[in-house]
């Protein structure tokens, strides 16, 4: 605890010196990941190009296995979205998240409220598929959109889990906020880092006989 306090005091003093001298010193963020609605870790200096801190809490289901996780790290501000995002591929494969992005030292040391997980179908549908180890995804199934999901997404690229890198592609329903994600972005989740080569996001078509 004493060493942690000394380290934090040093970082604060270093940041103040950088500000006074106009040196443009790198950002420092809390870095951690873990199960539950919060996590705590060490303050780390962000690498070049990463100019934001993020804290993200997510609730996900993978083939029906549910989990709640929290992630804190450095990332590029242009890739960071503050707020709620929901995606659904199948009734048992989905993720909802709430995130906060900020640009001052240690600004992600707190927590964010857990996302509201409304699984009520809203009548919209999107092409759906999950294709690990693949670059494309046919979308021959249909995802039933829930809650505030009004858009269809098609994301593809590479995913990193620790030292493992592999291809992935997926399609399904999403909230409009998912459209913030663009091709070329690095998108974090609790235990994975996605490098997107494709990030399509379009309004979901209304079913026949149903107008806007």
From Swiss-Prot:
Residues 1-24 form the signal peptide. It is found in: Secreted. Gene3D superfamilies: CD59. GO terms for cellular component: extracellular region. InterPro entries: CNF-like_PLA2_Inhibitor (IPR050918), LY6_UPA_recep-like (IPR016054), PLipase_A2_inh_N (IPR004126), Snake_toxin-like_sf (IPR045860). Residues 27-117 form the UPAR/Ly6 domain. SUPFAM superfamilies: Snake toxin-like. Coiled coil: none annotated. Its main location: secreted. Keywords: Disulfide bond, Secreted, Signal. The keyword Glycoprotein does not apply. Disulfide bonds join 29-53, 32-39, 46-74, 80-101, 102-107, 126-152, 145-173. GO terms for molecular function: phospholipase inhibitor activity. It holds the Pfam family UPAR_LY6. Belongs to the CNF-like-inhibitor family. PANTHER family: LY6/PLAUR DOMAIN-CONTAINING PROTEIN 8, PHOSPHOLIPASE A2 INHIBITOR AND LY6_PLAUR DOMAIN-CONTAINING PROTEIN. This is phospholipase A2 inhibitor and Ly6/PLAUR domain-containing protein. It comes from Mus musculus. The gene is Pinlyp.
């Amino acid at each position: 605890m004493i060493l942690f306090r000394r380290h934090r005091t040093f970082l604060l003093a270093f940041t103040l010196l950088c500000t006074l001298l106009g040196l443009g010193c790198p950002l420092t963020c809390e870095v951690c990941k873990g199960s539950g609605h919060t996590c705590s870790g060490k303050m780390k200096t962000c690498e070049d190009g990463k100019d934001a801190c993020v804290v993200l809490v997510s609730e996900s289901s993978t083939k029906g296995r549910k989990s709640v996780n929290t992630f804190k790290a450095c990332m590029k501000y242009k890739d960071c979205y503050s707020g709620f995002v929901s995606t659904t591929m199948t009734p048992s494969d989905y993720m909802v998240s709430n995130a906060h992005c900020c640009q001052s030292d240690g600004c992600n040391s707190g927590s964010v409220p857990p996302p509201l997980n409304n699984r009520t179908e809203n009548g919209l549908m999107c092409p759906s598929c999950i294709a690990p180890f693949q670059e494309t995804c046919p979308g021959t199934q249909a995802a039933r959109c829930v809650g505030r999901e009004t858009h269809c997404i098609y994301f593809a690229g590479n995913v990193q889990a620790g030292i493992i890198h592999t291809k992935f592609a997926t399609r399904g329903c999403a909230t409009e906020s998912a459209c913030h994600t663009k091709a070329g972005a690095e998108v974090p989740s609790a235990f994975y880092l996605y490098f997107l080569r494709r990030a399509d996001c379009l309004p979901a078509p209304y079913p026949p006989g149903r107008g806007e």
